[in-house]
Regions:
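Catalytic cores of Mg2+-dependent Asp-rich isoprenoid enzymes
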Residues: 1-132, 137, 141-257
């Protein structure tokens, strides 16, 4: 209903606000200060004294959606990881980034959609990580143009790939093998998410499920096109295909298996 729409719009506006700080800030310390201001604003929001228009828009939903303050802080922490633009040494740090960048939003969204079974939160957590890994794989070339590498350095090492290879689109056979491993990791998270979504919450969680299915099909398309020059061709799905996935998901089709 209308309440859910308003809550989602406010949550989306919050994500845009903090995301724009990272995208627009040329100077790290200015960005950090702005993110710190948002940390304070979240404290005010949960003390019923919001000042920022976006926080004011979130305010009526704090209690009704049972929002957890820590998830908002974790989203900001994820943005700060992005702002520092450092590399992620290992899979543990990489997964932490994915959790903050996507699972925290997913958990807040799951609260908006509504659930009766706690397992739904495990589904939202794993789906968030799956979506973020898919995003990272799809955007490797685009990110490298901005000097960003999200792939854990331990994986680059495992496949004998240098940062320079990623930044300048070299050593493609090895990169294809690495992408293969990352797609398998994402696929595992999609499957784990679906396995943890209880039947009784499938209806209310449908918006997230549709998104999960669209990204899962995108991941499969990436796997099919991963032949060695993956960094050259950014994979996407047509609007028609997305619509078809959305409709069939609503009718109960299982895409993730």
């Amino acid at each position: 209903g209308k309440k859910k729409r308003l809550a989602l719009t406010a949550l989306y506006a919050f994500c845009r606000e903090v995301d724009d700080i990272v995208d627009d800030c040329k100077e790290k310390n200015i960005g950090k200060n702005k993110l710190d201001e948002w940390r304070l604003e979240i404290e005010r929001l949960f003390n019923q004294a919001p000042q920022h228009p976006v926080a004011i828009a979130l305010s009526p939903h704090i209690t009704s959606c049972k929002f957890d303050k820590k998830h908002f802080i974790e989203i900001i922490d994820g943005m700060e990881m992005d702002l520092n633009c450092n590399r992620y040494n290992d899979l543990k740090k990489f997964k932490l980034y994915c959790y903050r960048a996507a699972s925290a939003v997913g958990l807040l969204s799951a609260n908006i959609f509504g659930y009766t079974n706690k397992s739904t939160l495990k589904y939202a957590h794993d789906l968030g990580i799956a979506l973020q890994i898919t995003n990272i794989i799809r955007d490797i070339a685009e990110d490298s143009e901005r000097g960003r590498i999200y792939i854990p350095l331990e994986l680059l090492k495992k496949y004998n790939i240098s940062e320079d290879d990623v930044l300048h689109n070299k050593n493609n056979e090895q990169i294809a093998l690495l992408i293969d491993e990352l797609t398998k990791l994402a696929k595992n998270y999609y499957q784990s998410a679906i396995n943890q979504l209880p039947d009784e919450d499938k209806d209310t969680q449908k918006p997230g499920l549709i998104m999960g299915n669209i990204y899962f099909i995108l991941l499969q398309k990436i796997m099919k096109s991963n032949t060695g020059n993956t960094l050259d061709n950014r994979v996407s799905l047509s609007t028609y295909k997305k619509l078809m996935i959305a409709i069939t998901t609503s009718l109960g089709k299982k895409w993730i298996r």
